Amino acid sequence: ENKLEPLSDEFFDTSDENNYYVNGVSPYIDRVFRENEIDGEPWSDYAAGYMWGITGMVYNPEEVTEEEASTWSILENEKFYRQVTIKDNVRDAYFPTLAILNKDLLNSETFRNTSDYHEQLSAIMNDTRKETIDESEQKLKEIRQNVYSFETDSGKADMITGKVVANLQWSGDGVYTMDQAEDDDFYLDWAVPEECTNLWFDGWVMLKSGIGEDAAKKQAAEAFINFLSRPDSAVRNMYYIGYTSAIAGGDSPLIFEYADWTYGAEDDEEDTIE
């Protein structure tokens, strides 16, 4: 739509030690941003990774079994009438309907063992043909009759207070919800639907309407991205919001040390980190 300002060549200069983003971004995420294109241009020309994760279900294991939570069909499961929430945005409401409509294929071993599984899966879950959208709309209408709400933020509190027993959630908000519940001695769990889930990325971009021809503004915007990409900034950010940074840290050990501290085994548990 010609609304974004491309990142400068200077932003990608690895010889500049203040370019924390290019020197510290996860190699995997860097590759994803370079290989995926829109209108022939890679994401990396315009976007710098911020956070990333998946979507899944936060659920109350006293009310919902792991098997019941491990499928997108929980959204239409009448056993949980008005006890499950779904996201109130196009992408995260559309995606589950495609998984439900194609669940038999997605769960088949034959399909999963095909040599181009990921390519076929991507095609199915990014299908925007009119007939597919129409089928998705009908499925969403059915889901709407069963769920407690379409929400963006309220699902976290609804889970903690017990208004609902399962909540479609982004992974970082899932961590936040489970941590808050644990503070109240209330145990919640997390499940990834067996059909598939989506891998999402948040990224920083610059709007042409905001930058214009002002080189100082562009330099300031890129400096802001680099500030947030400093390993110490990334750790503080992850700690506060519960999400996973796109920054791996480069030569700095801070990111790994934080991940080990947060998710590593307790003293009386087996450490599985290699």
Model-derived regions: residue spans:
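Periplasmic-binding protein-like
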Residues: 14, 133-141, 185-208
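Hinge/lid segment of periplasmic solute-binding proteins
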Residues: 1-52, 66-73
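Small-molecule pocket liners
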Residues: 53-56, 95, 201-204
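Ligand-binding pocket segment of bilobal, Venus flytrap-like solute-binding proteins
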Residues: 86, 92-100, 104-189
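Short helix-loop capping/hinge motifs at secondary-structure junctions, enriched
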Residues: 63-70, 103-111, 210-221
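Mature extracytoplasmic/periplasmic domains
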Residues: 204-273
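Ligand-binding "clamshell"
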Residues: 2-7, 42-44, 177-192
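Short loop->beta-strand "edge-of-pocket" segments that line small-molecule binding or catalytic clefts
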Residues: 73-91
